[in-house]
Amino acid sequence: MTNSGADQAGTQPSRLQWGGRFAAGPASVMQAINASIGFDQRLWREDIEGSLAHAGMLAAMGIISAEDEAAIRAGLAEIAEAIAEGSFTFDPALEDIHTNIEAWLVARIGEAGRRLHTARSRNDQVATDFRLWVRNAIDSLDGQVRELMRALADRAAEHAATIMPGFTHLQTAQPVTLGHHLLAYVEMLSRDRGRLADARRRLNECPLGAAALAGTTFPIDRSMTAAALGFDRPTANSLDSVSDRDFALEFLSALSILAMHLSRFAEEIIIWTSAPYRFIRLSDAYTTGSSIMPQKRNPDAAELARAKAGRIFGALTGLLAVMKGLPLAYAKDMQEDKEPVFDAADAAELCLAAMTGMVRDMMPDVLRMRSVAGADFSTATDLADYLVRDLGLPFRTAHHVTGRIVSEAESRGLELVALPLSVMQEVEPRITEAVYDVLTIEASVAARRTLGGTAPDNVARAAARWQETLA
């Protein structure tokens, strides 16, 4: 537990960037609540990248010497190597990643290191670092979403004609194909990629040079640093530059919708693997057992993917709550922006990997799915369509007639395809033997040839298009 004694001395003010006007250092509890190095050390690559771009611009504008720039570059390269190999010691007393790196730099190269922060504040520095990190995370996650889409498209092509029940209200509705069902998730994930791309496009402006909130008196070239860091342009307003966390919120929003899609699919995997359904079997690689029941094979990977969606939703609502009452410009509340973003990105990365593995690994029970697809009068809509198309009944009348025929079949314990013609004709005398041509599940799926329908040829073409797009 943290000692809350206010009289316990913490870091000496001389060690802190802002210590000049303070006679005493912060209390230990203040130091503990103020430090972010425990989590923002993940920004070390981006912090060094931003500092290299800033130093290059300062030298190009004659604000620091070429010799100082060279020393800064060498020192930052040494720091990067030390962090990468694990020999760099992060000091909580130095609060954050920015101060830790700068303190190490000054200790190694002296006065040149003190010049690096010219025309820069930690406010625009962290905003830049964080945008770079989120941009990298988007690129990485986009690649993972693409891999999951490829796995789904491959399995959809394999099962373009595999018939399964389609559900509404989790009740058997109409026959579809497994390939059609899997491609529905490909479409969802495609929109997720679009949202991530939109978020990336909007975040790709560089706040570096906004300084604390009002800009700087030095003749800097913000376009130069923006270009060096791969941004499209500098941000337009210095106050907005350091106050904005829309990019993080939009990222979390996109991840939340993605996580919702993954959670829905995970729920279906859980249902499909359950004993009453038995549509698919997951391999041992993605299931676990019970400590007491030897027979159990639990779909824990899917259950955890479903659960982690809640963490991602919580990250979004948590950061919205942090930001909702903050006046411009920067407030220390904004230090709480990173952990939810890091946690959500980590959870999404793990869920995508698990879902991709399960999709590639799952073993559908084709015969079981086909058997269930033919039950519960799943071709009743086809009967109603027949009455409209072949007998000229208005659809509402056909719907009513079909309902009566379903009741007759149900009372006899028969599916529609097995119901005698004479029984159907008692309800609608004009029905002929041709009705049986539309009542099989094969006929049902084959007849749905309209754009986006479940006909196997449609599904095969759609799967092939996605495979080509994602290749």
From Swiss-Prot:
GO molecular function, one term: argininosuccinate lyase activity
Pfam families according to UniProt: ASL_C2 (PF14698), Lyase_1 (PF00206)
Pathway stated in the Swiss-Prot or TrEMBL entry: Amino-acid biosynthesis; L-arginine biosynthesis; L-arginine from L-ornithine and carbamoyl phosphate: step 3/3
InterPro entries linked: Arg_succ_lyase_C (IPR029419), Argininosuccinate_lyase (IPR009049), Fumarase/histidase_N (IPR024083), Fumarate_lyase_CS (IPR020557), Fumarate_lyase_fam (IPR000362), Fumarate_lyase_N (IPR022761), L-Aspartase-like (IPR008948)
Subcellular location: Cytoplasm
UniProt superkingdom: Bacteria
Enzyme Commission no: 4.3.2.1
UniProt-listed PANTHER family: ARGININOSUCCINATE LYASE
Annotated HAMAP family: Arg_succ_lyase
Protein name: Argininosuccinate lyase
Annotated organism of origin: Acidiphilium cryptum (strain JF-5)
Higher taxonomy: Bacteria, Pseudomonadati, Pseudomonadota, Alphaproteobacteria, Acetobacterales
Gene label: argH
